[in-house]
Amino acid sequence: MQKTLFSALFSVFMLLLGAAEYPLVKDGKSLAAIVRLRGGTAVEIFAGSELQTYVEKITGATLSKRRSPSAELYNIYIATPDARGLKLPDKAKELLKEVRDDGFLLYAGGEGLYVIARERRGLNYGVYELLKRYGGVRWITPGPEGEFVPRKKDFSVPALAEVVNPSFRHRNFNLVSAHGAKLTPLWQMRNGMTQNGPLYGGGKHLGGHIFSTLLPDALYRTNPELFGLYKGKRLPQCGDPAKITKTGIGGQANQPCTSNPETIRIMQENLVRLLRKNPGAESFCILNNDSTAWCECENCRKLDPPEEAARGM
């Protein structure tokens, strides 16, 4: 009988715990504060501002920001595990072991609401998850006109203790433009894609059209055979021997002679050197020069796909 009674009481307790809600805003009144702990960076500030901005758009109420926890308000912590003054509940500490890459931990209990990430980029993702899941916010297209923000007087979160990790580390699509729209990277970030930038906590992504970086045009004067044969003449990648800069880097007018083993050897050595100089780079993109002028020497022609050669390409 006692065992049955205990089981029943325990079940009721668990149901009540699962049904617990922690209001950030109630009837249009702010009941929570964002606590900015010591040791934070621009990313923590930005993530907190995003939460504050969109909760205000939803409810009309402004979450306060503080340097220390409030005794009256529900405290919100957006931080990395090493933030000074952060006191994680035991359950949150245990779950933190499961966080990887730019994933995040969401924990909500009587102690407060915690958005914790090992990589700062994950802090933004954690905030956006809260706004999407409990605020119904959606960012459909870049810019204010492309966002959907429901209006209501309340904003609450249930009891939370979960880890959200990405399925794969790098998530993005490249917008091919020399002058990308400023709002587009933010829109991508809000939709879970990886972005560079100090506010986004992005990693270092290097490379691009770098053949002319890996094979400097300065070598043209002594080794023209490394460079592309175009209309019967070997040319540097800048297109004109008279325009070779002091460093000889950055030309994009044509491609080098990629059938020459020495060309490949030099490019390989310079690539390894670049990688060693940037050990923290998350990705390194290696693209040909931004030009359709390929080497027309006999050996390079042999590398052309037959269908393109037949079309004179």
Range-by-range predicted roles:
Residues T4-L16:
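Sec-dependent N-terminal signal peptides
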Residues L16-L17, Y22, R66, R133, ...:
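Hydrophobic alpha-helical segments
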Residues G39, A47-E50, Y54, K93-M313:
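Feature activates predominantly on carbohydrate-active enzymes
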Residues Q2-K3, A20:
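Charged/polar low-complexity intrinsically disordered segments
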Residues K3-T4, V99:
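Intrinsic disorder/low-complexity segments enriched in polar/small residues
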Residues S11-V12, A19-L105, K152-V163:
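Acidic, contiguous N-terminal accessory segments
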